[in-house]
């Protein structure tokens, strides 16, 4: 029998051994479980990463899963320079998944650097479907009536980029509307345009001159019909041809106003004519005869016309204007107006105070800091003094500089506003915004069919444009800088109401004219003219009415297009005009009156001025007046608005 001490020692040893084995077994079990758990985590993570990669690939595929099947410029494949134009893009979704994304249209200079702001259009496509997406870019004109060095690119999906074909140029475009299915009859001299591509707002019809119809458009929505009638009222020409039944089309709804027994009649400033033949018979000779009174495009050197009826014969062109070299560029482009507006925001600094502050600043830096160091013999004091001087004078220069700009943002604008039958206004405007605080600004107007562009040819603009029915322009403007932009829009109201009280003609010229006017005040008016036939007349205010004051000559004499080639620049045609250094804001607004007249009549050449002629039953009144609040940018952060607007109102003359 062992002693108690030996038994106790053996028990401790045995217990410790068993406990150790137990701990080792537990540790081994935990290691096995940990390995299994780690392998599970690894597998789970791998599956998650794989799922994310697959989802990303699917999303990338979906985001890119659209094909561009067709691209069309303008109404007949061409563009009007220095105007907003339509770019129609046919997009298809070939996948079983719906597509929701956006497409971006960007402009590049020579295919390299991006300039101007990007134009963005949202796109939604059902599986295996297609649709037309329309952009409304502003196309600048270069010397010689060409597109110049700018190119356009479409961006979509995740990095997909497609170059848009370079457009041909046609200031006046003529088309015949086709069934949107493309299954209609063919033939004839006019370019075909699918009816569903016709715009829904008047602001997008720049460049359209003639529309031929041999059937009623079946797919038009009410806004397209409204736009079409407004376009005619402002001067468009409609040609009605025989359809497949051998008869003229019979229109219904709002378009029923086109039904008439007359073969040639007026609709506002526009014209509706009937030509008793089908489209295949409407050849070049018939078209030239029908359009003999309409302005035509000028053929450029070494250019072969695709559509002969659109162009002036080169021989006729040279005879009409032997000095055509002087008409190489449009003198009334957006840049000419925006350049004048930009000059209106000029700082009026207190230069005496600024110079005094400058020399004080120099003296405090040296020898001020040097003397400070000798006095205290401590580099920390010198550094503190230098830093304090820089901070103090930075603040002071900022305050004095802001006072030079009036310490406020400013918007200056000019506009052309053409009266519409419903009391609305078809507006083309140019604006310059100056801001003292840098930020993103949203530019928006209270109207429909707003189109925006900076018209920039050399600078990339950090902004995004959404054109269309509810258009807007969001742009980053640095502090103490300008942003110019052009706008086309329809305002719902604001047209002056003018009525003829009396008039008298002598040898087809106005001898007397008295007009009642409502909507424009005498004190807000700068200039008033009237156009009757091919002649301008001066009007003046008398007892709250407008009365004839004198004959201002024919359109060519009034507009002086050849003399206005460099109106917005110096006498050499480039650079800054120092002769206008002292001009006031009012002086610059007055300077733009005649160019705005030319622009409103779509005149950029002497030969075009000689073709200006209104129907004999209309007088067009031009009022250059203070811009009302309805034209202003709808933004409280952009401060005051100052501008002038040229109202163009067609007034029917009573039948004598």
Please provide the spans of the model-predicted regions:
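Aromatic-Pro/Gly-enriched surface loop or interdomain linker
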Residues: 83, 139-210, 265, 270, ...
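Short edge beta-strand/loop segments characteristic of extracellular beta-sandwich folds
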Residues: 86-94, 514-518
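Intrinsically disordered, low-complexity Pro/Gly/Ser/Thr-rich segments with frequent PxxP/GP/PP motifs
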Residues: 106-143, 538-570
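A glycine-centered loop/beta-turn motif at secondary-structure junctions
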Residues: 193, 207-208, 237, 253-367
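Short alpha-beta junction capping motif
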Residues: 206-249, 269-275
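Accessory, solvent-exposed terminal regions and/or long lumenal/extracellular loops of proteins
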Residues: 347, 427-656
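Internal/C-terminal transmembrane anchor helices
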Residues: 380-403
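Alpha-helical transmembrane signal-anchor/signal-peptide segments
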Residues: 401-422
